[in-house]
């Protein structure tokens, strides 16, 4: 195994910086707590008592004199004219929030992972080491793993709630996305060029000789079926994870547009960010993407706007730009969520009757206490898509367009199936066979198909969930 050298030094340096600088310099903390976001403070009990005309009894004798052996909960009219004060969201306020430390660590790790990837790409572009392991792949894989962990952490909240409404919604969407994932896999490559068919063909071509040596010819179709079923199950679980982030995104998108009525440029960015999953779906729809740019239907003269390699590079760049665009409009979305406290109070004032003062305070505080969860719901799909894009470029053998794309080896298993010396023991021979089997399975074409499927499917789930969220908040939430 080749020595990592410079890449290992950069990895150790990055890990040290991430550990040492976290208390002093944090992108996640700056994104949420730099003072540009403001939150609403709940009205104090004294203010609510003054509005209700019920001053607090000064002592036990006064309560007994008024016939109150035990003080009843304070209730005020729902339309009481109290005001909600605002204050900047600071780090001191955020440290007590649930999941803030998880949010900070996850986002900062994703930032450092991106920095390692940029250095590695520059290192390979300038020096081109052929025998070194690309350590940025491990950073991206770790980030994808932590993204799934964040999805599990947030989704567990809905399954642990006493009310089963959120749990039912997750299970319903999981079943729906399971059906859609199975339908997507039967779409022809001429329509949806995810690359699953060439990837499976490459895998089976390399696995077939290995299975024949063991007499396991029957396992080849079973392996293909298992991979397709596994991709469908992964799509179902991912769809369940993205259900409530999509619903939340629709709500914050509507509110952010309302808050930015006098800023047309910001509204344009919000619309573009919201429709970014639709652009991602378009990138892999061959008739209206690759074929249209390769042979545009303009006049009788046939010409090509982009070559296949240029289209692949442009697709990678567009994916990165769309992820950065969604990151750029994070604060308008978070501010729109924090303003839900005021909207809930205004909705309360349109109702008749009385309400306990404690419930008013809880309605306001609950919005602020949930802001880190909303931040994770917004940023985790973005980070997952971005790192899958980086993995697609590296493991799929693509290029950024700044240099020639690396050539894909047609038979990677042939290199791993090198003759083993007679002096080597049985353990080394078994390890070599396992390495050959893995090399035949994880071919660049197969990884292209799997990663493209994950990127496309993540965008599809986000789009469907957010569109349903728009319909829900527009027509059903107020009814």
From Swiss-Prot:
Primary localisation category: membrane
Pfam families named in the record: Tmemb_161AB
Signal peptide: 1-28
Residue ranges annotated as Cytoplasmic topological domain: 120-134, 188-224, 285-304, 392-449
Entry function: May play a role in protection against oxidative stress. Overexpression leads to reduced levels of oxidant-induced DNA damage and apoptosis.
Similarity comment: family membership: Belongs to the TMEM161 family.
Protein's name in the database: Transmembrane protein 161A
Underlying gene: TMEM161A
């Amino acid at each position: 195994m080749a020595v990592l050298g410079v890449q290992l030094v950069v990895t150790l340096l990055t890990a040290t910086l991430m550990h040492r600088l976290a208390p002093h310099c944090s992108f996640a903390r700056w994104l949420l707590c730099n003072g540009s976001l403001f939150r609403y403070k709940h009205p104090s009990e004294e203010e609510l008592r003054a509005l209700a005309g019920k001053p607090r009894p000064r002592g036990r004798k006064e309560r007994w004199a008024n016939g109150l052996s035990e003080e009843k909960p304070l209730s005020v009219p729902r339309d009481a004219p109290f005001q909600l004060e605002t204050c900047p969201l600071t780090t001191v306020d955020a440290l007590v929030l649930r999941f803030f430390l998880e949010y900070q660590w996850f986002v900062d790790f994703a930032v450092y992972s991106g920095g390692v990837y940029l250095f590695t790409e520059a290192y390979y572009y300038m020096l081109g080491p052929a025998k070194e392991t690309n350590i940025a792949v491990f950073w991206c894989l770790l980030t994808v793993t932590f993204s799934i962990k964040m999805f599990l952490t947030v989704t567990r909240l809905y399954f642990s709630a006493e009310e089963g409404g959120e749990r039912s919604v997750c299970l319903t969407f999981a079943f729906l996305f399971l059906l859609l994932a199975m339908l997507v896999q039967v779409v022809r490559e001429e329509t949806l060029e995810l690359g699953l068919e060439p990837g499976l063909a490459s895998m089976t071509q390399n696995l077939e000789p290995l299975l024949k040596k063991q007499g396991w010819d029957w396992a080849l179709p079973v392996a293909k079926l298992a991979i397709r079923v596994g991709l469908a199950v992964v799509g179902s679980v991912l769809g369940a994870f993205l259900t409530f982030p999509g619903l939340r995104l629709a709500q914050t998108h509507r509110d952010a547009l309302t808050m930015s009525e006098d800023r047309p440029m910001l509204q344009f960015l919000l619309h573009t960010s919201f429709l970014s999953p639709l652009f991602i779906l378009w990138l892999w729809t061959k008739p209206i993407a690759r074929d249209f740019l390769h042979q545009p239907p303009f006049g009788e003269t046939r010409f090509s706007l982009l070559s296949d390699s240029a289209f692949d590079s442009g697709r990678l760049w567009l994916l990165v730009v769309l992820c950065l665009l969604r990151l750029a409009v994070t604060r308008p979305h978070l501010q729109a969520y924090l303003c839900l406290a005021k909207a809930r109070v205004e909705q309360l004032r349109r109702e008749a009757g009385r309400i306990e003062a404690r419930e008013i305070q809880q309605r306001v505080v609950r919005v602020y206490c949930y802001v880190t969860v909303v931040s994770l719901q917004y940023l985790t799909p973005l980070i997952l898509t971005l790192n899958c894009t980086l993995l697609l470029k590296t493991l799929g053998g693509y290029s950024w367009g700044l240099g020639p794309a690396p050539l894909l080896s047609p038979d990677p298993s042939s290199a791993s199936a090198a003759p083993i010396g007679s002096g080597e023991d049985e353990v080394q021979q078994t390890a070599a066979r396992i390495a050959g089997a893995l090399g035949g399975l994880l071919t660049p074409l197969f990884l292209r198909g799997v990663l493209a499927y994950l990127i496309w499917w993540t965008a599809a789930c986000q789009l469907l969930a957010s569109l349903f969220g728009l319909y829900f908040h527009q027509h059903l939430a107020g009814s």
